[in-house]
Amino acid sequence: VPLVIAFRLIGAALVVPVMEELFWRSFLLGYLINPDFKKVALGEFAWFSFVAVIVMFALEHHRFIQAIFAGIIYTTLVIHQKGLRGCIIAHATTNLGLGLYVISHQEWIFW
């Protein structure tokens, strides 16, 4: 069981942030501005895509309100930094912190 937990934590902290940010903020944020998303600069701002990506991101997570706040932070980082590095690091830090909390407090409901 400890090995399974270790793999879960590694996945949550390293794999999930990269994959989710590539989808939500690299692809979908641009796609909602222009379906030919490759023509949209990373971090380009439009209210509709900003709000839509945050809401859809939150709907995909267990804790909607908390995910709204996380989505606002991650999306704002992409827009201000014009890149994914900051939001991937923030997302990884969030997931690592949550994972360590879940393990140390045995609060498996958060996973």
Regions found by a protein language model. Give the residues of each.
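Transmembrane helix-loop-helix hairpins at the membrane interface
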Residues: V1-W111
